From Swiss-Prot:
GO cellular component: extracellular region; membrane; other organism cell membrane
The protein's role, per its UniProt record: Antimicrobial peptide with activity against Gram-positive and Gram-negative bacteria and fungi. Has been tested against E.coli (MIC=2.68-8 uM), S.aureus (ATCC 25923, MIC=2.68-8 uM), S.aureus (ATCC oxacillin resistant, MIC=2.68 uM), K.pneumoniae (MIC=10.71 uM) and C.albicans (MIC=10.71-32 uM). Probably acts by disturbing membrane functions with its alpha-helical amphipathic structure. May penetrate bacterial membranes, but stay at the mammalian membrane surface. Shows a very weak hemolytic activity.
Sequence ranges of Acidic residues compositional bias: 30-41
Modified residues (Glutamine amide): Q73
Taxonomic source organism: Agalychnis spurrelli
Family affiliation: Belongs to the frog skin active peptide (FSAP) family. Dermaseptin subfamily.
Record's keyword annotation contains Hydrolase: no
Record keywords, A-Z: Amidation, Amphibian defense peptide, Antibiotic, Antimicrobial, Cleavage on pair of basic residues, Cytolysis, Fungicide, Hemolysis, Immunity, Innate immunity, Membrane, Secreted, Signal, Target cell membrane, Target membrane
The keyword Membrane is annotated on this UniProt entry: yes
Protein name: Dermaseptin-SP2
Amino acid sequence: MAFLKKSLFLVLFLGLVSLSICEEEKRENEDEEEQEDEEQSEEKRASWKVFLKNIGKAAGKAVLNSVTDMVNQGEQ
């Protein structure tokens, strides 16, 4: 009977250890996925910044050209 108890405790202990290791690996994988998601969102933000900057430049040039044309027409 004592042998059976020791065997059962050993099996339970090894099961808990393996479960603990699996949980730790799962947490590490989740952390890596979160970091990848953060990197992707940063890349998206950077691309949006560039896009909006280019739109701003184009709009500014268009307004400047319009104003310049109006001024030139007024001088004539």
